Curated annotation (Swiss-Prot):
Keywords: Extracellular matrix, Secreted, Signal. It comes from Gallus gallus (Chicken). Residues 30-99, 290-335, 358-396, 424-452, 467-617 are annotated as: Disordered. Residues 495-506 have a biased composition (Basic residues). PANTHER family: COILED-COIL DOMAIN-CONTAINING PROTEIN 80. One of its GO terms (cellular component) is extracellular region. Binds to various extracellular matrix proteins. It is found in: Secreted, Extracellular space, Extracellular matrix. This is Coiled-coil domain-containing protein 80. Residues 358-389 have a biased composition (Low complexity). Pfam families: DUF4174. Belongs to the CCDC80 family. Promotes cell adhesion and matrix assembly. May play a role in eye formation. The keyword Signal applies.
Amino acid sequence: MNWMPALSLALLWTAWLVCGSEKTGRLAERGSHGVRKVPQSHRAPSSLLRRSGASLKNLSPSPQHPVTKRDSSVPPKAPANLLKEESRSQPRSVGTRTRRLQRLTAAAKYSKSEMIKDEGISTASQSRAVRFPSGSSSPNVLASFAGKNRVWVISAPHASEGYYRLMMSLLKNDVYCELAERHIQQIVLFHEEGEEGGKVRRITNEGKILEQPLDPALIPKLMSFLKLEKGKFGMVLLKKTLQVEERYPYPVRLEAMYEVIDQNPIRKIEKMRQKGFIQTCKAAGVEGQVVEDDNNGGSTQSIPGGGHVQVSAGGRKEEPRRSSNQPTRTKTVRKPMTTTVATPLPTVRTTTLPTTTTATRATTRTVTTASRPTTTTTPLPTTQRTWTTKSHTTTEYHRLPASPEVTTPRVMASEDFYSPVWKANRRDRQRGHPEKHLAATRKPSKGGRYESFTEVPTAPSVHYTKASMSRFKDNRTDRKDYNHRDLNVTPGQHKPTKTKPPKKKTQEKILSNEYEDKYDPSKPASPHLEEEIAVGSIPPKKGKESKKHERMDKPEKKKKKDRPDKLHKSEKQSKKDKAEKKSKQDKDRSKKNKKGSRTENEDFPKPNKKPFLQPPRKSVANLLDYFEGKRRLILITTPKADNTMYVQQRDEYLESFCKMATRKISVITIFGTMNNSSMKIDHFQLDNEKPMKVIEDEDLVDQQLISELRKEYGMTYNDFFMVLTDTDMKVKQYYEVPIAMKSVFDLIDTFQSRIKDMERQKKEGIVCKEDKKQSLESFLSRFRWRRRLVVISAPSDEDWAYSQQLAALSGQACNFGLRHITILKLLGVGEDIGGVLELYPINGSATVDREDIPANLVKDIRNYFQISPEYFSMLLVGKDGNVKSWYPSPMWSMAIVYDLIDSMQLRRQEMTIQQSLGMQCPEDEYGGYGYHSYHQGYQEGYQDDYRHHGSYHHGYPY
């Protein structure tokens, strides 16, 4: 029985082992998604783990950090199946533990190799992008659009071609969000010899246009690839697969192009995926803005403030002063060791320069102390610091002049004063200098960037070198002091600087005496300070200035005491010289000796006249120089665009487009009051003349330019006023009320310059006749914002639908006139085509003026509106030139057309004016369906017909 206790102990030990193994298995299963623990007895020694290079703590995933980033310092996670096997297995010996650690190490290496492989793939794709560029100057410019965008190619001989100008006039600023929603990009080609060129117009998701120049060598290749005909206008619409979807030999309305694109099945998916795209695009507020883009993907847009805006390829505009997401840059800071002795309170002044992300250029800055202490400057080796910043700052370096002694040079950096880095360094600097009134001598160290900054009391004097001034000459308004704490600045520091370069030493003394006479030398803003600013802007005088600094900074007090006496003597001497020169000039004036006066004018210019009075006169002079000898001007002022007198005058000259063009008239219209105005310039030109662009768009709202132009011609009234000038820009006639253009033309024909033009135009055969071949653009411009067009097309005048439509139009002259409707009839097929234009008076009278339309114009109109000549069709064109509704079958009653017109916003304003004037048609003529109210019988009788034709109203808002 002695074996019983031993048996019981063995059973207990076995049960303990079994329970322990089950508990370990449950913990392993429970921790499959959490932290996996290994019993302490089965863990490898820490030294072995360190030697193997894989720690269980690092390999086990953490709940707070389940995913390891690529650039993280933590090793990547091992595969889940390996860890699961390790948690379930029970190691029984050291060999088992060693094998487990080897497997974990292999798993870590496996993940690391996957990570390296993934990075290699991205590097390969980047290298592919470098080897196969897709810029506008590369041969595969079309390949950059493949699979992503539709391409709309416009080809024209040159930019002044009539069809091209008409097509570009249809591309208003509010259409680019529609184009971006359909993934349309534009390529413009000019293929005439000598004017070959082009541009790629990339439309961003915000409706902005990034224009990239196209290599002229690619023009013939693209023309042959797209099968475009040379010497003619043509357009091609390409699918996303770069296959030709549609060809257009004439300009077409954008709705016709949208209709072709929207028929593709992929458009349904695009619409579902891009819900609200157009609203978001228009809300960005940059639709239609054109930005010139270079081929590297970046773009630069000039702004009126003088700086530059950097725009990325995605269309994002960065701020002019700060740019985000800047790469790591290496900047070199020169740290001079400065020894300064001074007692007044310090003043800190910083100048922030405009941001440019292309390059960092150096500018020279010298800060001069008011008390002129003795300074010893020792330049140390340059130290390179590398850091990454979110707000871009332009560092200013100070290059030491070539002189043995300099007055307190400093290396300062323009920083972002709102960044936490600057605040922290500012606090460190203040803690490092508790006693600012004592002299501080500091040795620059490599560890701290700001330790070399010696705070000394200064009356700041900043003068730039020629290089820096040429770069920032237009950016004076951008150099603002955002941290202005200089409380002791006297008014003398804000005086305008002199720009005259002194020629001789005696003249330099005279300049100094003038400043000494104006300002008190005992004040911090010393006369020497102003003298330094005046001379410091001229690079050849830097040596003399440094010598002057050297002479002024010597510690001998004797010279400082003697200086006022010398200044008084030189001042008296200068006055004597002036008096002698003046008397000598008066004596020699009768002998016509202008040498002395010219020398004096060179020595003593009037610096205040040029910078303030010259630019406005020069701007107006430049504006008028464009027209002088070439064009005649009609200048009109009006308080607002919808002024009644202005609208009447505008309609007058728009009706006489050809006569205005033959007389070379340009119209400058100024809207608004004397203090707040905008300007518009219209040039009336013949088809063979190149389009003119006199000034940029920002100059059209230049208040100073408009004010000077008003004063130049005496147009200082806020009411309607009109001025007529000849080619010499001299006023010929004033008009205070609208005038018929026939009387204006009769007056112009009496000008001597016009008589010569008439003789020359008669020899060249340039005349304006009603049957003269006119372009589609000039024809449509007659009706834009003045008349609504009802275009009726039929294969012949015997067509049944055409005759039915004519029956419905009979007796509607009054309704057509009050609604400003003009009927345009296009008849015929093939070569036997023609047309008739019927004009109805706007006062509602029954008289009708008819004009014949030539065959070439009928063909152009049908091509423009995409009208088939083989079938009957009728369409309504609004005053804005857009098609409002299509009618493929005759309308038995014009009530439906009147209903659509009367719902337009512009028509409602017309109705209000006509009702106030009592203008209406008799009830018996229009049968009760005028613009006042519908007769109940017509309302019920044509309700079904309206529903039938409702599908042809394409949902236009007006």
